[in-house]
A protein has these predicted regions:
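Conserved catalytic core of nucleotide-sugar-dependent glycosyltransferases
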Residues: 97-167
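Glycine-rich, basic loop-to-helix element that forms the pyrophosphate-binding segment
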Residues: 64-81
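C-terminal catalytic/acceptor-binding lobe
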Residues: 159-246
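Conserved donor nucleotide-binding strand/loop of the catalytic core
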Residues: 52-69
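Short, acidic, metal-binding catalytic loop of nucleotide-sugar glycosyltransferases
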Residues: 24-33
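Short aromatic/hydrophobic "clamp" motif used to bind/position activated sugar donors
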Residues: 87
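A conserved acidic beta->alpha catalytic loop
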Residues: 40-48
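N-proximal low-complexity "stem/linker" segments adjacent to membrane-targeting elements
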Residues: 1-23
């Protein structure tokens, strides 16, 4: 019997990508019990209305305001509400592309392997390892929350959301299955590094921030990532490839 799984994502707008995530989870979930938990932080673009109509989606509203209400805290709330022990955390602009996305990750969690997913490499002051399992695709066990798995930031700006989990798992002597991030040429729209795919999961990157922090993303990327030159062409390519009508 395949391990049941709770798929968790945090949303704040981005109807197109959220709907695509839900539909692709259904397509590639296989013969296992599952649920999809969506923690919404204030969507106003039709995302909530569509999610409320989905029988396999558990919708949890958590308004975004002030400290202790960031992405990591919202994701942790989803884990606490999850029905199943195995957790697959996805960013709202990610989705599975292959049938083996869970057999590569969730199904390999055991007494030694406590974390599996997509590896992001960067030098952050608070992380001595130079890499971590990125929360756009991270799998772990619910019972490890607060012990090995912490999704909120614990070290200020010296680490990123979700990075604490990798640090703690390694500190305690457990193993991690870390899959490389690769450029997803199938959905290339002109940017040399994004979108990506890892362990069968696609990630668009930047989408939520393009809705909420457009000017910041434009400045950080030197204009290489905008709604016009990245997000909109990517949506059109996804529509064409997957034959979507939304």
């Amino acid at each position: 019997m395949l391990r049941p799984v709770s798929v968790i994502t945090v949303t704040n707008g981005g109807y197109f990508f959220v709907r695509l995530l839900v539909e692709k989870v259904r397509e590639f979930i296989g013969q296992r019990e599952y649920e999809i938990l969506v923690i919404d932080r204030g969507s106003r673009d039709g995302t909530l209305e569509w999610l409320k109509q989905q029988p396999d989606v558990v919708l949890i509203k958590k308004r975004q305001w002030g400290r202790r209400h960031d992405h990591g805290e919202a994701a942790e709330l989803g884990v606490k509400k999850a029905r199943y022990e195995a957790i697959a955390l996805l960013d709202s602009d990610a989705h599975p592309m292959q049938a083996d996305w869970l057999s590569l990750t969730v199904d390999k969690l055991d007494e030694r392997v406590r974390l599996a997913g997509a590896t992001f490499r960067d030098k952050h002051e608070g992380n001595p390892h130079g890499w971590y399992v990125h929360p756009h695709f991270m799998t772990f066990l619910k019972s490890d929350l607060e012990k090995l798995i912490i999704l909120r930031k614990m070290r200020g700006h010296t680490t990123d959301t979700g990075e604490e989990a990798t640090i703690r798992v390694l500190e305690k002597g457990y193993e991690i299955l870390n899959y490389p991030l690769e450029f997803c040429a199938q959905f290339a729209v002109g940017h040399p590094r994004v979108p990506t795919v890892s362990a069968g999961v696609f990630h668009a990157w930047y989408v939520t921030r393009l809705f909420k922090e457009t000017a910041t993303v434009d400045r950080e990327t030197g204009g290489a990532v905008t709604r016009e030159n990245y997000m909109h062409p990517l949506q059109e390519l996804l529509r064409k490839t997957y034959k979507l009508n939304y």
